[in-house]
Amino acid sequence: MGPIGAEADENQTVEEMKMEPSGPGHTTPRGELAPDSEPELKDSTKLIEVQIILILAYCSIILLGVVGNSLVIHVVIKFKSMRTVTNFFIANLAVADLLVNTLCLPFTLTYTLMGEWKMGPVLCHLVPYAQGLAVQVSTITLTVIALDRHRCIVYHLESKISKRISFLIIGLAWGISALLASPLAIFREYSLIEIIPDFEIVACTEKWPGEEKSIYGTVYSLSSLLILYVLPLGIISFSYARIWSKLKNHVSPGGVNDHYHQRRQKTTKMLVCVVVVFAVSWLPLHAFQLAVDIDSQVLDLKEYKLIFTVFHIIAMCSTFANPLLYGWMNSNYRKAFLSAFRCEQRLDAIHSEVSMTSKAKKNLEATKNGGPDDSFTEATNV
């Protein structure tokens, strides 16, 4: 299975259709059904009340994700003072999450409700690829943001990344993600599967070279787990732990101790939230997909589709959590959001001039007094 598993494995759908309860205590093979009967999946996702809950859950995530990520992108484009290197990375994260909202969730919900692939052969190849691409860009960008903060705060580097370099990094993130996601487009098969005579379903499944139970699928899943979860989580956790330690041990001038203490607390909370959200949201889905590839009997679970869907919903919650963590928890973004709603374009020029002037004076005085440098100020503002 791919790194996102946007559609539940069609093999499990086929297995469930082959054998279905026909009465208390026994089952009837599909080949013995009455002539006018039609196969139906007997899992919880076919219950109307469950479908209503799933529709509400997915629609809520789509709405929150589209609004939140669109706002982040909008304020970075609209306000000149927001066009910093870190904010470019955050905007790129918002673009990737926005693609996840628009490309992952609607198709996953459609498949879950309908039980088969209804989007045609072209989208059978393109949709999983686009989904994998968006998720990988999002993960790489989260890692880049952590490394950028670590570089500026822990090592006090005076030479910051230029905007040109930041765009190059963003381009590389998309290029690497496009390459890593390519197997999801190449190794796919759009086909009709006959369940019983005169009844077929449309399937869009992974088709790896070699035998039916190819090792390639398992290798790809293990690689995806390592590249998209284990390695990024390790880098992000290490970077933010170093940042937290640096902020904790930094000594501020006596007059501003309370001010910087409060800002450190806010920064620490945000850093912890970033790591926890990433770890908790993606672990169930990655682990479940890996279990499917290692042991195909997982597909025989009666509630396979429901379990998969719940884990997928948990993972997708990160798409609206990211703009909250990187945007709304930041005072500059909050002001920009409010200004955008009020259409106060003039505030941008004023904010830019005043903030740069006051910041320069404050940093000059702080440096003379042995106070905090610019990297610590930025640490609580990114």
Swiss-Prot record:
Residues 1-46, 109-125, 188-217, 291-305 are extracellular. One of its GO terms (molecular function) is neuropeptide Y receptor activity. SUPFAM superfamilies: Family A G protein-coupled receptor-like. Pfam families: 7tm_1. The chain crosses the membrane at residues 47-67, 88-108, 126-146, 167-187, 218-238, 270-290, 306-326. Residues 1-39, 363-382 are annotated as: Disordered. It is found in: Cell membrane. GO terms for cellular component: plasma membrane. Residues 68-87, 147-166, 239-269, 327-382 are cytoplasmic. Glycans are attached at N11. Disulfide bonds join C124-C204. It is a multi-pass membrane protein. The keyword Nucleotidyltransferase does not apply. A lipid is attached at C343 (S-palmitoyl cysteine). The keyword Cell cycle does not apply. Keywords: Cell membrane, Disulfide bond, G-protein coupled receptor, Glycoprotein, Lipoprotein, Membrane, Palmitate, Receptor, Transducer, Transmembrane, Transmembrane helix. PANTHER family: NEUROPEPTIDE Y RECEPTOR (PTHR24235), NEUROPEPTIDE Y RECEPTOR TYPE 2 (PTHR24235:SF20). Belongs to the G-protein coupled receptor 1 family. Receptor for neuropeptide Y and peptide YY. This is Neuropeptide Y receptor type 2. It comes from Sus scrofa (Pig). The gene is NPY2R.
